[in-house]
UniProtKB/Swiss-Prot annotation:
Family named by the database record: Belongs to the ArgJ family.
Active site as annotated: 190 (nucleophile)
Protein name: Arginine biosynthesis bifunctional protein ArgJ
Classification via NCBIfam families: ArgJ (TIGR00120), PRK05388.1 (NF003802)
EC number(s) per entry: 2.3.1.35, 2.3.1.1
Organism of this sequence: Neisseria gonorrhoeae (strain ATCC 700825 / FA 1090)
Subunit structure: Heterotetramer of two alpha and two beta chains.
Major place of residence: cytoplasm
UniProt-listed PANTHER family: ARGININE BIOSYNTHESIS BIFUNCTIONAL PROTEIN ARGJ, ARGININE BIOSYNTHESIS BIFUNCTIONAL PROTEIN ARGJ, MITOCHONDRIAL
Reactions the enzyme catalyzes: N(2)-acetyl-L-ornithine + L-glutamate = N-acetyl-L-glutamate + L-ornithine; L-glutamate + acetyl-CoA = N-acetyl-L-glutamate + CoA + H(+)
Entry keywords, A to Z: Acyltransferase, Amino-acid biosynthesis, Arginine biosynthesis, Autocatalytic cleavage, Cytoplasm, Multifunctional enzyme, Transferase
Length: 406
């Protein structure tokens, strides 16, 4: 069950001028499930995207990468669930291209203007014929419906919106959806994220902004430490709000727009953790006073992805030596353990290389029983900090993944 996460209504997710959404039941996932989504993009829009670092990246990832920078510009994104089209060799690419061609015919653009995305079971052929047959049957959809259509093991559709001033006079809107519940780990995971904004941004600048936003949001979460074959995060800028184009990172509007979109993306990223497979708790791990941000993130991830730490949280067991052990093996060079302080929420648990004299088991138990917990580690060796978001590891995670294909 998702941790403090509820489904957004259509009214909470405003339309973005220049974007049209469509969904259908293609029969790829399971009969009766909406499993196909098409995001139609107005001509003149720009698109930025980042993808998985998994060497076995899926066929649609290869195709999407090549179509992203095509001089004709992106006009559509087509997303299927139920099949990842990964580990499918040359035929997988042929199938992905066939889907692009069919989607292009549907909306009246070139095949190279369509970016394909897939999520689901790996090492199974993509039933491209089912997707192609369903495309003409697609119906207009709202953002909340599109969010549900891209789900796999998710239990709650993930969507969010933002509105704010960018520049002196223009109000910018942005709405996004994401999916992900398991195989979640930085760079990125079994996660798909799509954000659309009516701001006007040049493609090179939008690409850089997309990379920065992904690093600050989706690359700060972990559910199980597995990096998927299909991760993709996309930002579409339609330019329909009449502002002049942001074509330089030195433009003050760049930082304003990035802040707005970063806030939206972080909500989506945290929603993925809140809906982690079998999750019962949402945990924030913050490492402070590190020498570098990379060092801080490295230590935070060591604690956040430890199965022993995560199962202790599930059991509400203040066996907090597991956290100290994780920081110890995080490979922080020349770490002086006598300087390290560890807090559970605001309770000092460890200092001077051991248990704090003021700490009691009852204090730890009280915090561990909550459904949202913050772990704070102070290394006292610099000014850098990093925050990572994770969840506990429950019996539910094992059951969901053991039964995934049944």
């Amino acid at each position: 069950m998702a941790v403090n996460l509820t489904e957004k209504t259509a009214e909470q997710l405003p339309d973005i001028d220049g974007i049209a959404l469509y969904t259908a039941q293609a029969g790829v996932k399971k009969p009766g499930h909406t499993d196909l989504t098409l995001i139609a993009v107005a001509a003149g829009s720009t698109v930025g995207a980042v993808f998985t670092t998994n060497r076995f990246c899926a066929a649609p990832v290869h195709i999407a990468k090549s179509h992203l920078f095509d001089e004709d510009g992106v006009r559509a994104l087509v997303i299927n669930t139920g099949n990842a089209n990964a580990g499918t060799g040359a035929q997988g690419r042929i199938d992905a291209l066939a889907v692009c061609a069919a989607a292009a015919r549907q909306i009246g653009c070139k095949p190279n203007q369509v970016m394909p995305f897939s999520t689901g079971v790996i090492l199974e052929p993509l039933p491209a014929d089912k997707i192609i047959a369903a495309l003409p049957k697609m119906q207009p959809a709202f953002w909340n419906e599109a969010a549900r259509a891209i789900m796999t093991t998710d239990t709650v559709p993930k969507a969010a919106s933002r509105e704010g001033k960018v520049g002196d006079q223009h109000t910018v809107r942005a709405t996004g959806i994401a999916k992900g519940s398991g195989m979640i780990h930085p760079n990125m995971a079994t996660m798909l994220g799509f954000i659309a904004t009516d701001a006007k941004v040049s493609q090179p600048v939008l690409q850089l902004m997309t990379q920065e936003i992904a690093d600050e949001t989706f690359n700060t979460i972990t559910v199980d430490g597995d990096t998927s074959t299909n991760d993709s995060f996309v930002i579409i800028a339609t330019g329909k709000n009449s502002q002049s184009e942001i074509d330089n990172i030195a433009d003050p509007r760049y930082a304003q727009l990035k802040e707005l979109l970063c806030s939206l993306a972080l909500e989506l990223a945290q929603a993925i953790v809140r809906d982690g497979e079998g999750a019962t708790k949402f945990i924030t791990v913050r490492v402070e006073n590190a020498k570098t941000c990379d060092e801080a993130r490295q230590a935070a991830y060591a604690a956040a992805r430890s199965p022993l730490v995560k199962t202790a949280f599930f059991a509400s067991d203040p066996n907090l030596g597991r956290l100290l052990a994780a920081i110890g093996y995080a490979d922080v060079a020349d770490l002086d353990t006598d300087l390290v302080e560890m807090y559970l929420d605001d309770i000092l648990v460890a200092e001077h290389g051991g248990r704090a004299a003021s700490y009691t088991e009852a204090q730890g138990q009280a915090v561990m029983s909550k459904d949202e917990i913050t772990v704070r580690i102070k290394l006292h060796r610099g000014q850098a900090a990093a925050t990572v978001y994770t969840c506990d590891l429950s019996h539910g995670y094992v059951s969901i993944n053991a039964d995934y294909r049944s």
